[in-house]
């Protein structure tokens, strides 16, 4: 990975953007039949020229999200997902390429759009080949409210001395 990350304490901040993200997570959870979730951590990514994010998953999270604040013109390092069916695809003979037969799928992202996905889904970002930075705000969710979490877990995620709201 090449890029900058900043951590923020979502429990101490109540920006309209985070409230909107939580509302979107509530709607998404309802649509897919999940229990409600709460945003448990957030950060921002600045992907400079030549930067990329390797394939990864978000362990100990239910739903993850990425909001694209600023997309430069051109080949800005698209968001991709890895098919969870990859290990089971034997002898695929597609007539044409579709998301159903692909190992990797480049998600057609747009500026100022929020993308939610199950945290177990492997994903990453292609290389930013533009002269400008690509900015995103990302977050994870938990099936528990912060007050229900073990204080040791809270400290490991948000740091020593974190106070519940």
Locate the predicted segments by residue.
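Single conserved hydrophobic/aromatic residue that forms the stacking wall/gate
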Residues: 1-11
């Amino acid at each position: 990975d090449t890029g900058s990350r900043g951590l923020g304490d979502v429990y101490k901040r109540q920006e309209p953007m985070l409230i909107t993200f939580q509302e979107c997570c509530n709607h998404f959870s309802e649509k897919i039949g999940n229990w409600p979730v709460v945003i448990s951590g957030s950060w921002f990514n600045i992907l400079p020229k030549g930067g990329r994010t390797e394939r990864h998953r978000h362990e100990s999270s239910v739903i993850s999200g990425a909001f694209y604040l600023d997309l430069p013109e051109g080949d800005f390092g698209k968001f991709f997902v890895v098919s969870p069916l990859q290990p089971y695809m034997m002898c695929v003979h597609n007539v044409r390429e579709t998301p159903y037969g692909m190992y990797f799928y480049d998600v057609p992202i747009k500026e100022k759009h929020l993308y939610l996905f199950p945290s177990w889904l492997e994903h990453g970002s292609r290389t930013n080949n533009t002269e400008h930075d690509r900015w995103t705000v990302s977050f994870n969710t938990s099936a528990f409210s912060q007050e229900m979490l073990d204080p040791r877990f809270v400290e490991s995620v948000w740091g020593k001395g974190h106070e519940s709201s």
